[in-house]
């Protein structure tokens, strides 16, 4: 049976739509992180008070992810993508308008919820588009997210340099979201021809999904460690200048983005199991060797290799989790993403606590060891047989 040209038009548009949403997600988060110091200054917050506000954001994200799983499976990504994206852009503005810490915490809780909702909704939509595309394309979506994060950070930095307030910065980004999200929503993939309620799915557990979440947890411990500790390691442990120390996280981010840009081709060539196995080994050897050498240049290279190694792991795990039972993809991805987010938050804290006992260089071996664990457990990404009632293809 041959496909008509029209059969490929909507998947292409749907892929572009999801790419745009991943990009917006990255822009929102990148802009927010660069303007956190302005929020702190405007409200005269101590480090501890700011931490409470950021904890509210993290709690909201977990709540949003958990709620999104069931909402997506019940109502579908088609209905949820646009309102969730618009809400996330709108609530980005709210922290900049908060008059005190209590209101700030409430705003960040709400912002975290919509951010978690958008995370799960767009990742589930990506799995749906990949299923319709019939080829590995998940890494490309995450590459666009990385690009969006860079753009958002650049926008936030330029606005800060120009003396614009955080509120003006966030309003600008919210306006961009309000323009682009409806355009993307017009091209989103149509819902499946088989309604979830008629498939008989949704009963019993999701075999293996929790373990897949553990793999993403391990991966995001490495991402969090690079974000929070790479520059500190180069500056405090290796004695590099602050400017050169910042190159460690820059190398990590650039190599992660580059890895995701070629991730789909690598997936098609190697398959998810071998790709994740080789990726885990690359991440572990790169960081581990750099820690053994103990030189600033080696440190930058090591964190770059860590980024390259971790780049394709999470997209492959999301693809595997979302493909096990398409009718419950939202719940599966929510479980995996929640565990991953927990790793991103808890991992750096654990490394910091351990560094007090054994030193930062030794504590930073944790991400390397976890990357080796992911490599050893890569066989868990072998595809399971789809649920018989949900094996129908996505219609376009």
Predicted features and spans:
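Short amphipathic helix-loop junctions that connect adjacent transmembrane helices
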Residues: 34-48, 228-244
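Conserved MFS/SLC helix-loop-helix module at the cytosolic interface between two early adjacent transmembrane helices
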Residues: 63-102
């Amino acid at each position: 049976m041959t496909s008509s040209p029209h059969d490929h038009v909507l998947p292409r548009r749907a892929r572009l739509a999801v790419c745009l949403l991943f990009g917006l997600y990255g822009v929102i988060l990148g802009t927010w992180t660069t303007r956190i110091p302005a929020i702190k200054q405007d409200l005269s917050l101590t480090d501890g008070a700011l931490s409470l506000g950021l904890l509210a954001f993290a709690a909201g994200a977990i709540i949003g992810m958990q709620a999104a799983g069931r909402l997506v499976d019940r109502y579908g990504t088609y209905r949820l993508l646009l309102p969730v994206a618009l809400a996330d852009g709108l609530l980005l503005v709210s922290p900049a308008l908060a008059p005190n810490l209590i209101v700030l915490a409430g705003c960040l809780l709400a912002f975290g919820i919509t951010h978690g909702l958008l995370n799960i909704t767009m990742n589930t939509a990506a799995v749906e588009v990949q299923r319709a595309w019939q080829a590995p394309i998940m890494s490309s979506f995450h590459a666009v997210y990385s690009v969006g994060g860079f753009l958002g950070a650049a926008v936030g930095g330029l606005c800060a340099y120009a003396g614009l307030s955080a509120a003006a910065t966030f309003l600008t980004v919210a306006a961009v979201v309000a323009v682009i999200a409806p355009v993307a929503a017009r091209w989103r993939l149509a819902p499946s021809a088989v309604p979830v309620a008629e498939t008989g799915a949704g009963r019993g557990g999701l075999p293996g999904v929790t373990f897949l979440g553990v793999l993403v947890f391990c991966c995001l411990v490495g991402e969090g460690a690079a974000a929070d500790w790479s520059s500190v390691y180069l500056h405090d442990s290796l004695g590099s200048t602050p400017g050169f120390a910042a190159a460690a996280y820059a190398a990590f981010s650039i190599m992660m983005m580059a890895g995701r840009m070629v991730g789909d081709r690598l997936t098609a060539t190697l398959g998810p199991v071998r790709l994740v196995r080789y990726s885990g080994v690359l991440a572990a050897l790169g960081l581990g060797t750099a820690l053994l050498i103990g030189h600033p240049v080696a440190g930058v290279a090591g964190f770059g290799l860590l980024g390259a190694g971790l780049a394709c792991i999470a997209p492959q795990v999301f693809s595997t989790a979302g493909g096990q039972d398409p009718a419950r993809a939202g719940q599966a991805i929510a479980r995996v993403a929640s565990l991953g987010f927990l790793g991103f938050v808890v991992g750096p804290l654990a490394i910091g606590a351990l560094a007090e006992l054994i030193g930062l260089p030794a504590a930073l071996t944790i991400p390397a060891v976890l990357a080796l664990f992911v490599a050893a457990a890569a066989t868990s990404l072998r595809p399971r047989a789809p649920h018989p009632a949900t094996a129908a293809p996505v219609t376009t």
